[in-house]
Design a protein with these regions (language model features):
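N-terminal cap/leader regions of alpha/beta-hydrolase-fold enzymes
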Residues: 1-112
């Protein structure tokens, strides 16, 4: 599970280490490693805000496209959400979306 820059490492662990599941919330730099997506066989759950200036929508759309044929991938995009939408105490925190994304990650991990 990676938050912000940890999203990149969750993706890489899934690709290189064979973890049982991977998740990222407002995960940055995943787009740098999309060439490794085809090596990922575990369930993944990635969550992004469409107003996140740290992760351009072009990158989010590329991530979504890279996982299009993955049978156990959830790539969620939350309208109106910025970076740190799931982090309590941050200005961009949205409690409802934080709960939705957290529940999705838990479902992903339970599916392993």
């Amino acid at each position: 599970l990676g938050f912000c820059f940890g999203g990149r490492y969750a993706h890489l662990c899934a690709a290189r280490l064979g973890v049982n599941a991977a998740a990222a919330l407002h995960g940055t730099k995943i787009g740098l490693h999309l060439n490794e997506t085809d090596r990922i066989t575990c369930p993944v759950s990635y969550h992004f805000g469409d107003q996140d200036t740290s992760i351009p929508m072009e990158e989010v759309n590329a991530i979504k496209a890279a996982y299009a044929n993955h049978p156990n991938a959830e790539i969620a995009i939350y309208e109106g959400c910025a970076h740190n939408f799931s982090t309590p105490g941050k200005p961009a925190y949205v409690e409802e979306i934080a709960k939705i994304s957290r529940d999705a990650v838990l479902r992903c991990f339970k599916s392993m």
